[in-house]
């Protein structure tokens, strides 16, 4: 029983340490990467190219990716610069 508790504790500890981020892919101009007119596999392929686990076209408007590395640029409301120039 103690081994089981230790195993579960280690499992949760590893899960807390290894965190990945989710988010919308971002264009160089700071806007979300659109997917309305793209092929069906566009978003999952782009997410994989950036080392994400998976992705999809959210409401046919923008690519959303799961488990992206911390270094991958994703759109964030707090740092939004879309349409604001450089």
Curated annotation (Swiss-Prot):
S-S bonds: 31-82, 35-57, 43-63, 47-65
Entry-linked CDD domains: neurotoxins_LC_scorpion
Domain of life (superkingdom): Eukaryota
GO MF term list: sodium channel inhibitor activity; toxin activity
Tissue: Expressed by the venom gland.
Signal peptide residues on this chain, from the entry's feature table: 1-20
Positions carrying Lysine amide: 84
Annotated SUPFAM superfamilies: Scorpion toxin-like
Stored Pfam families: Toxin_3 (PF00537)
Compartments it resides in: Secreted
Residues annotated as domain LCN-type CS-alpha/beta: 21-83
GO cellular component: extracellular region
Keywords from the UniProt entry: Amidation, Disulfide bond, Ion channel impairing toxin, Neurotoxin, Secreted, Signal, Toxin, Voltage-gated sodium channel impairing toxin
Similarity remark: Belongs to the long (4 C-C) scorpion toxin superfamily. Sodium channel inhibitor family. Beta subfamily.
Summary of the function given for this chain in its UniProt record: Beta toxins bind voltage-independently at site-4 of sodium channels (Nav) and shift the voltage of activation toward more negative potentials thereby affecting sodium channel activation and promoting spontaneous and repetitive firing.
The record's note on its domains: Has the structural arrangement of an alpha-helix connected to antiparallel beta-sheets by disulfide bonds (CS-alpha/beta).
Protein name per its UniProtKB record: Toxin Td1
Origin species: Tityus discrepans
């Amino acid at each position: 029983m103690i081994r089981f508790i230790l195993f579960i504790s280690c499992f949760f500890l590893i899960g807390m340490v290894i965190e990945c981020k989710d988010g919308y892919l971002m264009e160089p101009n700071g806007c979300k990467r659109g997917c309305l007119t793209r092929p069906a596999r566009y978003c999952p392929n782009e997410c994989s190219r950036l080392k994400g686990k998976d992705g999809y076209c959210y409401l046919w408007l923008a690519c959303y990716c799961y488990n992206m590395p911390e270094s991958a640029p994703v759109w964030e409301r707090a740092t939004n610069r879309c349409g604001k120039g450089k």
